[in-house]
């Protein structure tokens, strides 16, 4: 085991559901996990709602926005964290043409991007 202790996670516009039957899940799994991944012991961890996986997570801070094409992934994962009674916080920015997928990474000089970093740091300080 690693000596690295993770106190909290900050997840920006996450691609949590890589094997859903959607535009991403139709082609991505075989590239990420290999053609026969469903036959491996790793397969159960591809589902981010796997209870074992959820229970092993440090507190989670999530951010998305109305115009994020992966917003549903983030809000669904937040619901899974809620059902598993895991410590987490979700920030969901309202509709704005500049606040697209991972805006805080791709557009770091937006005021909202600075706010994302500030909020994430504040969350981390709790732990």
Language-model regions: role of each:
Residues 1-127:
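Alpha/beta-hydrolase superfamily serine-hydrolase fold, recognizing
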């Amino acid at each position: 085991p690693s000596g690295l202790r993770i106190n909290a996670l900050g997840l920006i516009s996450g691609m949590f559901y890589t094997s859903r039957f959607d535009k991403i899940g139709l082609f991505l799994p075989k590239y990420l996990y290999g053609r026969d991944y469903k036959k491996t012991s790793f397969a159960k961890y591809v589902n981010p709602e796997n209870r074992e996986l959820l229970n092993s997570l440090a507190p989670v801070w999530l951010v998305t926005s109305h115009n994020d094409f992966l917003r549903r992934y983030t809000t669904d994962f937040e619901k899974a964290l809620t059902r598993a009674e895991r410590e987490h916080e979700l920030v969901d920015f309202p509709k704005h043409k500049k606040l697209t997928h991972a805006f805080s990474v791709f557009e770091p000089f937006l005021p909202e991007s600075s706010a994302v970093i500030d909020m994430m740091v504040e969350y981390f300080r709790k732990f």
